[in-house]
Swiss-Prot record:
The lineage of its organism: Eukaryota, Fungi, Dikarya, Ascomycota, Saccharomycotina. Residues 106-115, 141-157 are annotated as: Interaction with ARC1. InterPro entries: aa-tRNA-synth_I_CS (IPR001412), Gln/Glu-tRNA_Ligase (IPR050132), Glu-tRNA-synth_arc/euk (IPR004526), Glu/Gln-tRNA-synth (IPR000924), Glu/Gln-tRNA-synth_Ib_cat-dom (IPR020058), Glu/Gln-tRNA-synth_Ib_codon-bd (IPR020059), Glu_tRNA_lig_a-bdl (IPR020061), Glutathione-S-Trfase_C_sf (IPR036282). It comes from Saccharomyces cerevisiae (strain ATCC 204508 / S288c). It is found in: Cytoplasm; Mitochondrion. It holds the Pfam family tRNA-synt_1c. This is Glutamate--tRNA ligase, cytoplasmic. Signal peptide: none annotated.
Amino acid sequence: MPSTLTINGKAPIVAYAELIAARIVNALAPNSIAIKLVDDKKAPAAKLDDATEDVFNKITSKFAAIFDNGDKEQVAKWVNLAQKELVIKNFAKLSQSLETLDSQLNLRTFILGGLKYSAADVACWGALRSNGMCGSIIKNKVDVNVSRWYTLLEMDPIFGEAHDFLSKSLLELKKSANVGKKKETHKANFEIDLPDAKMGEVVTRFPPEPSGYLHIGHAKAALLNQYFAQAYKGKLIIRFDDTNPSKEKEEFQDSILEDLDLLGIKGDRITYSSDYFQEMYDYCVQMIKDGKAYCDDTPTEKMREERMDGVASARRDRSVEENLRIFTEEMKNGTEEGLKNCVRAKIDYKALNKTLRDPVIYRCNLTPHHRTGSTWKIYPTYDFCVPIVDAIEGVTHALRTIEYRDRNAQYDWMLQALRLRKVHIWDFARINFVRTLLSKRKLQWMVDKDLVGNWDDPRFPTVRGVRRRGMTVEGLRNFVLSQGPSRNVINLEWNLIWAFNKKVIDPIAPRHTAIVNPVKIHLEGSEAPQEPKIEMKPKHKKNPAVGEKKVIYYKDIVVDKDDADVINVDEEVTLMDWGNVIITKKNDDGSMVAKLNLEGDFKKTKHKLTWLADTKDVVPVDLVDFDHLITKDRLEEDESFEDFLTPQTEFHTDAIADLNVKDMKIGDIIQFERKGYYRLDALPKDGKPYVFFTIPDGKSVNKYGAKK
């Protein structure tokens, strides 16, 4: 009698491994397992007959003859890794597991070797297929061996068509249950369903304030809004929330659009909150007439204390007529009386949620607006403006970082009070990094205090700052998308994002040589060129497409002093890209004499040295490293960041580099062999050399430029 495998198409982790195992069995022993699909979020992911536990191993055990091609202990090890580690949504842990799998697949076609896949491959492939975070990782070849192996198995119809089988079965199930009128399903890496989202009707928005440069937190918000708009075949609005003329500049607005363009984000519309100043003014008048808002001239500090203590303002019961006069005549015209007042929403001054304690919704500001000039003397606050403009522009889903969660009730109250349509809110966690400030106010303070050069300083978490440090657009985008719309608030290490970047730059970064504190070595022997000799060598040994570079060979060379200090007389060392030499003498001035031994075995030498010919062709360079701007991983609410400033955050090292750097242009990324990755930031000028910024490589010992 055949067994029955029941797969839950709506399980948080779809049982692809079990499904594929059953398809393998049926391919070799037809009709051995009947495959049934259910559409029930509460049902187990998989069930074999009546068993809901350890279903994959039950299938492979029952049909052991089919899956008997691998060491049982090894199979169990990889099945365990698949079921416990490859399905998790924590990027840091998932990345470690993928690296383990990638290492195992090095020089192997399948996980356990051999010419055919085993149960280990089925379990791991199925786990990756079910994990939404893995889609972009595999597509972008973050782990090369894993991507190659995954693609190979995907070409097998038993694997590759598993998703189509699942989708078609689910569709048939829905048709038979007469639920075809529900929203169309969509492929989503983030495994969430937006409430009341309808295919083709979803509208999201990214609303940056033009008061600073785009930082990584903004990049996540922008990419998530773009993702869901595209996933539901909807629209994305890029809206500048320009309601505070004291902070905003057209310069910031232009830079935000440029950075979004670099990230591949283009809105279907670009709008401005200032486009709706008249509408928001009218809505405020409506609220006052409805008795839902009042003008208040209570001094700022006293108002703050009253809100904290749940005390009603003395102005809370002003008449509608008095409130209208102050708002439409005094505040609107910026008179002396108007400047003393603000408008507050009349919600609940005793509310447990303190954001509902009569928040301010309009203020006077005489600073000319960068778009509307001096037309307006009053401006809506963020909390009043956003729900109104969202409703006017047709936004269906407002994605906001989780620190706004307490304000969600306020957002909904504004829409209800003004009788505007409902907009759904979806919270997600902002990206936080250790020893990093994302507050625009704090970043501006550092700019004003000359602690950094500007908003594009390589120590800043702005998109421009990290790009100047050497972050690629592809690396940044892949990292942000890998985080998904998680609501878990965590402080990430910078090595995570730089590890993504390394995957992008390592295969294509030309290899160059830089020498610090050069020590001379004179080479003896007939093989040592008496005159400088140039040969063309590949810039990247593993990627000929990167091109060629000039390497000068000569009897006199220089090496790093750190290298010279650890090698001894009579020791054989390897000069990279040349051959072995035997040190025959160390002079009092530190220089050395060596004899070429090009027939020597480089595998037997302890030290492999980078070197340059000691000629006039060497190029002076400045290698710049950076540390974090603050010394503490995470600041508490009562701690001031000024008390935790890192004393020194910029470090310069003089060096000489090979002549090929003269062909570089600003922004080029290279690797100085045995030193790391670098981005060219400045060309020689006014006697200053080429300036290269270090690019962190993702190792925990070198967190975002922190000195070792």
